Design a protein with these regions (language model features):
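Extended, low-hydrophobicity, Ser/Thr/Pro/Gly-biased non-transmembrane segments
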Residues: 58, 118-221, 244-247, 466, ...
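A surface-exposed beta-strand-loop module
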Residues: 74-137, 162, 195-196
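N-terminal, polar/Ser/Thr-rich
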Residues: 18-52, 139-144, 162-164, 460
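Hydrophobic alpha-helical and helix-loop surface patches within well-folded domains
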Residues: 203, 229-494, 500-501
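Beta-strand-rich interaction surfaces with strong enrichment in secreted/lumenal proteins
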Residues: 40-43, 57, 89-91, 103-107, ...
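Solvent-exposed beta-hairpin/edge-strand motifs
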Residues: 65-89, 507-509, 513-517
Length: 518
């Protein structure tokens, strides 16, 4: 470890404060109506790759309006009505905007209404919306169904306000083949026969949450589980593979206990499943649905015939990442995709921190160094972007899932924690969780909580520079000089760039931790 021969903490480069931008666009939908609760009924037809849906949305009209617009994609509406309004609305859809609009003959007054819709949807073969995965077993070919909604594909499953700031509660019931297991965000509340070899499974009302965190899974599944405090932790697999999830279950138990303590807010749901799915996707490996994490088998299960140390570490770290999201992302959610890093940077940092703490023998600190160096290489290019970047479209939101968001975000958090101290940082995170549980935030909400507890080491100005502007500071350290019993080191700052040698350097207030030797 390199230690500076200094006796104080310094900050390199006095630079003017960089203010956070004004609140970005946080919705592409009209602000006249907000959802309160979705009551969803789904009847999937897996062999035919289609499903029938019915949703009753309790909503609040905030100001007089003659229309209600929400998100919908690849859905066919059979009928719609607003309870208490005699005339049925006229329905129009906009495939490009991914919306459906319901127009009424007379203006709706402010108040609470229920919009009732019957519709049909498609089951895809790619991992968006409700999709199917086919796999082969000793008993032949099988098909299982899963959902993947982040960042904007819940609209393929339910007509909805499919944006993170529109939090609401959800009740789901599904009519499915009697021999199969249904998995959702909460444990099933009831099951009853539905005729023709079908059963209806109903799930209780969720806490308020964003649409992209809803989950539905159906298939020939096994499940193993264990209790951690008030929470049942489970691993769901295709039949015959449950024991391959034993390591992941033990990992989840240890991680959940650690997170309950670290965040200061116990996991609020009665169960936390990790659903292992066959196959893989070129776009993602796992998804943090609240109480129902989705992970491809290769990243979570351990086959004793081919298990390696790397696969064990991967299973643990993926578990740690997705479980961290249950707080950073699920309990507290960014208001819009500009602040995606609040989800991914923090989950990446918690993943590394927790893996290193619970398995120090793995020496995983090198992984953080590798991630940081990778992000720096990209951040030194002209094509880089700030950690917090303005997002206007769903396509731009999809492109924001990159190494700047993940690895640079993780590195900046590690730097700031090191600057203020681990205990102070944790206290700020706990205050943030308590204040903003079940709500949406922007990054400055976190900085305020850290500043409130760090006091003599405010971080907002430093954090703004590292999150609101792109690039990498380059710190040069001169040879130490000793005179009159004092040791001095001169530090100068520039900008590290690989393809813009003549670019005027940006400036950062860089926290420097200085220690003496001996």
């Amino acid at each position: 470890m390199l230690r500076f021969l200094l006796a104080t903490t310094a900050v390199v480069a006095a630079v003017p404060a960089l203010a956070a931008p004004d609140a970005a666009v946080t919705t592409q939908l009209p602000r006249t109506v907000v959802p309160l609760h979705y009551d969803v009924s789904i009847t999937p037809d897996a062999p035919k790759l289609k499903f029938a849906g019915h949703v009753a949305i309790r909503l609040k009209v905030l100001e007089p309006t003659t229309s209600i617009t929400l998100n919908a994609l690849d859905l066919t509406f059979r009928k719609a009505r607003l309870l208490g309004v005699t005339a049925a609305p006229r329905i129009s859809t906009d495939a490009k905007a991914q919306t459906a609009t319901f127009r009424f003959a007379a203006p709706l007054k402010p108040g609470t209404y229920t919009l009732d819709m019957v519709y049909d949807g498609k089951i895809g073969t790619q991992a968006v919306g409700l999709f199917a995965l086919d796999y082969t077993t000793a008993k032949g070919k099988k098909r299982a169904l899963y959902t993947q909604f982040e960042n904007s594909d819940a609209r393929r499953f339910i007509p909805s306000w499919d944006e993170p700031a529109y939090k609401a509660t959800f009740s789901v019931d599904a009519t499915v083949p009697a021999g199969q297991m249904v998995v959702a965000n909460l444990p099933a509340a009831s099951k009853k026969p539905a005729g023709k070899g079908l059963i209806n499974v109903r799930f209780p009302q969720t806490s308020v949450m964003s649409t992209y965190l809803l989950f539905f899974g159906l298939g020939d599944f096994d499940r193993i589980a264990a209790k951690v405090g008030a929470t049942e932790v489970g691993i769901v697999t295709q039949k015959g593979k449950a024991e391959q999830g034993r390591f992941a279950l033990d990992a989840a138990k240890a991680i959940l206990a650690e997170y309950n303590d670290y965040f200061g807010v116990p996991f609020p749901l009665p169960k936390l499943d990790n659903i292992a799915a066959p196959g893989r996707s070129q776009f993602f490996g796992a998804m943090e649905n609240w109480g129902a994490i989705f992970t491809f088998e290769s990243a979570i299960l351990l086959d004793p015939k081919i298990e390696t140390q790397f696969s064990r570490e991967t299973s643990f770290s993926v578990n740690a990442h997705e479980m961290a999201h249950q707080w950073f992302g699920d309990l507290v959610t960014m208001a819009w995709w500009d602040d995606l890093w609040l989800n991914e940077g923090f989950a990446s940092w918690m993943e590394g921190r927790t893996t290193a703490k619970l398995h120090p023998e793995w020496n995983t600190a090198l992984n953080a160094v590798q991630g940081r160096e990778s992000a720096m290489r990209i951040d030194a290019l002209k094509t880089t972007h700030p950690i917090i970047q303005h997002v206007e479209t769903v396509e731009q939101a999809s492109q924001a899932f990159d190494s700047i968001t993940y690895q640079k975000g993780e590195a900046v958090i590690a730097m700031l924690e090191n600057y203020v101290g681990a205990d102070i940082w944790r206290d700020g995170v706990r205050a943030y969780m308590r204040r903003h549980a079940y709500q949406n935030t922007v990054t400055d909400d976190l900085w305020r909580e850290i500043d409130a507890v760090s006091k003599d080491k405010p971080i907002t100005e430093i954090a703004h520079r590292f999150t609101l502007q792109p690039g990498v500071p380059l710190i040069r350290i001169d040879t130490a000089t000793c005179a009159d019993g004092q040791t001095q080191v001169r530090l100068t700052q520039g900008e590290y760039t690989k393809d813009q040698p003549d670019k005027p350097a940006l400036a950062w207030p860089v926290p420097v931790i200085a220690r003496t030797l001996g």
